Amino acid sequence: MKLPVYATTGQKIGYYGFLTYFGLVFFFLIAPIFVVLPLSFSSSPFFEFTREFMSFEPEAWSLKWYRNMLNICSVEMTTVCTDKWMRGTVNSFYIGIISTLIATTLGTLAALGLSRPHMPFRALIMAILISPMIVPLIITAAGMFLFYSKLGITHSFTGLILAHTALGTPFVVITVTATLTGFDNNLIRASQSLGADTMRTFFKVIMPLILPGVVSGALFAFITSFDEVVVVLFVGSVEQITIPRQMWAGLRQEISPTILSMATCLVALSIALLTTVELLRRRSERLRGIKQR
């Protein structure tokens, strides 16, 4: 929004006050990243900006916390070298990828069903599907623990995958439903009139048009699973340790800059995934003929 050429004094004050306010909010949100990033390269075992570090002295900068994260031990380590960070990384990707695949499949099918005209109880079904986004996570985690305990799948990868699938499905439903808005059903009729069966119509006509929404929803589902800690604490065990759980345990048991190294990697991963989502959103708008602003 640009300031009008003939803006009054009050409009100018409101405009620049608006920019100042949101600039401060943005700084408040982004400032921790600028603290975590440099400290992850510090040689000090404490979360501090030493005089040598601020003077850019070579001995004050180090990659040892990244080596500790990768379980590459050395004699200069002042903390216990452990493989929990690598095990947590492997488990997080394992749980995240499988739960994302399941959530993407279920969410896409649900969105296609809800997009059909004259769908009965559409609002009720939609409310149930997106309820994991609305209900407080601690309540969802407690309910999952009680339900999974009766099924005997707590403290297992199966329980965590199912739990993260439930948390990720709403994101897929919402993004695919938004992509299907304005979808021309005449394309389906034209495909069927040319002799294509249901499966061929789906993969050759529908899927290419909704693919940006599907991938965006899948990325959001993966980020949700990768960054989730509350459900892991309820449903998982020591064997199912993930990166967020290891970071939480590290803050409680052993304050180590290795946590900052992992946080820096997670920030980089999040930026890459969100950039991909934005590129897919723009591609989807081009396919749907929406003018870029």
Predicted regions and their residues:
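Membrane-interfacial helix termini and adjacent extracytoplasmic/periplasmic loops
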Residues: P4-T8, T50-P58, T82, F121-A123, ...
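Short membrane-interfacial helix/loop motifs at transmembrane-helix boundaries
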Residues: L3, A31-C81, G236-V238
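Transmembrane alpha-helices
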Residues: T20-Y21, I30-I33, V173-T179, F183-N185, ...
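Non-cytoplasmic
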Residues: F41-F49, A142, L146-F147, H164, ...
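N-terminal signal-anchor/first transmembrane alpha helix
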Residues: M1-L39
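Transmembrane-helix boundary motif in ABC transporter permease subunits
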Residues: K2-Q11, Y94-L129, A142, L146, ...
